[in-house]
């Protein structure tokens, strides 16, 4: 059962990597569709990244209050909503609206899974975990390439959303596999830093 859960966790990290390469691979066609300069991709990417940072900074509070499996489910749902939103966007400004759930879905799930694996598995499992993020990041440009060849850029986002839905179903089916007594930090003994406190840590602002 433990090995099955590890497989699901690896699949979750493939899911995490899937949306990240779509904008770059599809933008040359998208910019023509929206009638905007190529540099405008940066604004969309910046919005997604900003929301990911916000989500990641909120993750300590979420992890201490919500079981990891529910953070995973909610995060994948947000990503699916963002991908579907991108696929139906007919105006450039619409991308910014759907970039919000698109980015929020990436930050907390990353931190939550890392936290879970660090507390429940060996370092080798953690190393392989991040390899599977790369698998997802490699798959999505190929999905977009297939969409551009046989359909439109919109389909690249839609097909990726379908793949995310399939992964979500696997996660839902696997809910009983998650440990009931997940290792959590005791808030009374160890304080979880909030956003303001995290930003005060030397080097954090420069890194962002």
What are these regions (language model features)?
Residues 175-208:
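Juxtamembrane intracellular "pre-TM" segments in multi-pass secondary transporters
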Residues 82-86, 102, 171:
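MFS-fold secondary transporters
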Residues 98-132:
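Cytoplasmic helix-loop-helix junction between adjacent transmembrane helices
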Residues 54-93:
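Conserved MFS/SLC helix-loop-helix module at the cytosolic interface between two early adjacent transmembrane helices
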Residues 94, 128-179:
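Helix-loop-helix hairpin linking two adjacent transmembrane segments in secondary transporters
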